[in-house]
Amino acid sequence: MIDTLPDNVELFENSQLLEWNKNNQIISCQFKNGNIKTKKIIFATNGFLKSLGIKKNYNFPITLTASMTRSLTDEEFESIGSPQEWGVLPVRPMGATIRMTKDRRILIRNTAEVHNPLRMSQSELIKRSSKQKLGIKKRFPQLPNNIIQSTWSGIVSRSRNSSQIFEK
């Protein structure tokens, strides 16, 4: 999408917005490294829309944490039936997801919580990784305990009616 933007559209990524206001159909934005005035703007803020004073009671950030195993050895892969790649997705938006990737890794996400996503410590991340290790062990008890290679967290935005917030 970025590569196909028309010439009259400018993209500002990783630009901390300090203040904005709208006056007579002109939007003024003050950033750390400069200012812009425009008639139209897209604030791509995910769960942080309310920090801009927009739709304060409509959405909030949810922290999701996922872990991925290292690639399974031939022996480990055979012990779980040598499956093709597969995935189980939840019926509910915040339910657990587990997948077997083409390169024999297991990806699991089974934590969704209201948590300040900018302040997760390494020990908190390790706690969540332990939950995911438990989820993998319940389904695949024959796999070793040290199988998780990486764990990460990110945010998604939830709105009161489970839809996106997009308007002029």
Regions found by a protein language model. Give the residues of each.
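Helical element adjacent to the flavin cofactor pocket in flavoenzyme catalytic cores
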Residues: 1-39
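Active-site substrate-recognition segment that forms the wall
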Residues: 19, 35-36, 43-75, 79-168
